[in-house]
Amino acid sequence: MDTQIAITGVAVGKEINNDNSKTDQKVSLPKADVPCIDKATQTIIEGCSKDDPRLSYPTKLETTEKGKTKRNSFACVCCHSLKQKCEPSDVNDIYRKPCRRCLKHKKLCKFDLSKRTRKRKPRSRSPTPFESPMVNVSTKSKGPTDSEESSLKDGTSYLASFPSDPNAKQFPNSRTVLPGLQQSLSDLWSTLSQPPSYGAREAETTSTGEITTNNHTKSNGSVPTNPAVLASNDEHTNISDAPVIYSTYNSPVPISSAPTSINSEALFKHRPKIVGDEETQNVKVKRQKKSYSRHMTRSFRKQLQSLIISQKGKIRDISMKLDTWSKQWNDLVEKSMFLPTIADPVSVGIISHEEATLRLHLYKTEISYLSKLPFIKVEENVSVDELRKKKPILFSVIMSCVSIVLTPKQTTRGTIMKLDSFVLNLITNQIFKANNKSIEIIESLSTLCLWYNFFEWSSKTRYHIFNYICCCLTRDLGPTYVNRSFGMFSDEDPKRFKSPLELYSNGASLTLLVYISALNISIFLRQSIQARWSHVTEKACEDLVKETKKSRHYDNDKLLLDSADDPILVQFAKMNHVLENIHTHLHERDLNDDEFDDPIFTKKYLNKLMEKYHKQLQEIFTKLDRNRPRVIAFYYSVEAYLYQYKLAVFIGEMSHTINEKVELPREIMDDFVKCYHCCKSALEEFSKLEPILITSLPLFHTSRIIYTVGMLLLKLRYSVVAIPSFHDLMPLTDDAIALVIGVNNLLEKTSELYPFNNSLYKFRYVIALFCQTYANKVIDVADRYNAEREKLKEKQVIDEVSNGHDGTKPINAYVTESQKMPTEEDPIIDNNTNQNITAVPDEMLPVYSRVRDDTAAMNLNINSTSYMNESPHEHRESMTGTTLLPPPFISNDVTNSADSTNIKPSPSSSVDNLNDYLTDINSLAWGVNSLNDEFWTDLFMNDI
């Protein structure tokens, strides 16, 4: 380590090593009696490189816009140890000239520029379009390796290694970034009503398997433009046995657009901890233990508890798994590259020939045959070698997609990640490099979109990009008007001119599959629909209906799926056509345009549309086979989506009277009942499926089922709980919680059997968010209504004291509301009060039961959301008439009601125990934002 002693007026600089060890950065001070150092004119500067300009040139003290001098960013070692302000003796040369304190006491002034004077919190601002917050990501967890995996042969002729750049600089982590978003969490929390559960903290080294961030700062370091910095520091990930090239060419040069440089999964350690873990944050959002929600009825609390018990810790556990796998996947993709000459995964040794044979067999049987829908057709007797030779791209995609039905005994996660990475590079090379426009590319992209299973977060998915390219290729190779116009130059009749997709034997089926997948993906991501119903899809349906086995010209080869399944595909496509119309003409309507229209005409027009779509769905339903539960479940989800629109419009119109009980129109009540029965039927049909049928479901199919779960829980069930006008429909939705728990348990069972289906984990994560959001919002409604009830009681007492008997005058204003409430004679409520948690008992509304005398009511704080504005005097009078059924732990007679005030809730249903299963608000906010604006967010009603 060299020590540089400069001439008079120049600081003595010390060069430190470029490693991260703090011990290497420390250098011994020169002795005070060294004759070459003048304490009055020279200083010692540590912690900067040899070519740092602060060593050679004077540094002026910064000034503000108003001309005032700023405080020095670095204090000298002496002032820093004394915690005193360091004032430079020369404001035009603050580092090379001693400070006033050292100059006064004739001490040697030394500056350590390798560390800051304090830990600064990052500024809460969003990055500009010209900059992007960068972080260096490293991990101690080993990559996906396994002794049983197929090792690749060394010395492959077309593979060469590209060493990483050793001069790649590092840069500090300046902010916490949401997964896949250029926005800091501090910016997000500022828009929420809850305070942030964590602030900007220095990153710390975590245990094995956790992700850490690099905090050391290089003085005068700038963000490097060399893309090798994105892949040069991870030396612990063991993926050397993959046939990949470690190259700097894989990372994009523009840092702001690097797909994985801002690795959202690497920042998972900054997420707020879930309730139940050790508290490590300075600020923690917790629900107050002294909450009005303890006065819910026992059955309501027990059923609510059964819901969130089933989801306890699921958000944390699933997100940790997704985070770990996504980190490994991104590392592998970021650092690997397969040359275009690579044809298939068998030739490079990612999977063996035996495993490829197994995967192809599973695709033919478990995915294609059992699906009862003619997806991408493969001949039954085609072998691995034949498919590799004829359609190597489709073969590679099939090998990747079949991972969803494999068990741990059949493959490993490391092999799957290598295979997915290979497919990603192969597809990219064929589309963007080789410019390959063929039917095989359409088949490959369509298959990939149907069973997309890459290990990545929702905010990092690429299937919508593949879907867009697939739609473009379908238009290019399909019967477009461009192809028709060029037909006039041929010898054939232009009307008989056929496009490549029309000439292909499975062209009609492929056209409908692209339409179905593209439509659902567009709705799923709330994007503009890429493939709409047109004359092309209409003609494809007609061709499939007329098609026979003989017209396919397969004399010796037998197709796995013959023409008998084509009518099912046609009906499924028409069902999606109705879904497209419902989404486009109803859910995506611009309500602002209605301001200029006649409301009566608009209402009639919408009613006619709904009647038309309902009639079309009924015609399709009569042609469906009742023994196909997956198709029937999809149908019910579409029909529920139809009725959901009218309910959403009605709730939006009554937002100003949302807390008042008004009589529901008959048509709204009927639509609510129909919507609930459709949701219930869809989930019941889905529950009939075996795990193998669930794991082989396409992405678009499962997404509609999960959306139906959220609609049932957060739209329908929450409406009868929170909106007084829907209270009378409470008995109808009593089995909603049991259905949600049943679907969740079925998905968990399927995930245990097929742990490599990453989409199942994502859907379980969404259901966990649904359940936790529902529980939090229900308790918030209970607290809010009871708090307002207490305020009204206090106001009533003050009015009675101040005005005497005049205080009872406004009471009669609420008599009408009390007469509209349900009575004790409701047989559905009376029959559901003695169920236990395991059987998922009926969940009472937060319509908290009333007792006969005022003392018991005041002690128990029991009230009703529908009686929120009711006075104690009216409360006593209304008990003589029709009244609401009391909760199970309060008797109907006065004596038992008074004695019940001393009964304590059981530990299994106490509100404190209930709060232990709730996830904090910040975690829910993070989870919702990580869904990348998917259509789940439409289900959260924040205005109720």
Curated annotation (Swiss-Prot):
Keywords: DNA-binding, Metal-binding, Nucleus, Phosphoprotein, Transcription, Transcription regulation, Zinc. It comes from the Eukaryota. The modification Phosphothreonine is found at residue 128. GO terms for biological process: aromatic amino acid family catabolic process; cellular response to acidic pH; positive regulation of transcription by RNA polymerase II. One of its GO terms (molecular function) is DNA-binding transcription factor activity, RNA polymerase II-specific. InterPro entries: AAA_Catabolism_Regulators (IPR052780), Zn2-C6_fun-type_DNA-bd_sf (IPR036864), Zn2Cys6_DnaBD (IPR001138). It is found in: Nucleus. Changing residue 452 to C: Causes hyperactivity with constitutive induction of PDR12. Homodimer. transcription factor which binds to a weak acid response element (WARE) to mediate stress induction of PDR12 and FUN34, encoding an acid transporter and a putative ammonia transporter, respectively. Present with 907 molecules/cell in log phase SD medium. This is Weak acid resistance protein 1.
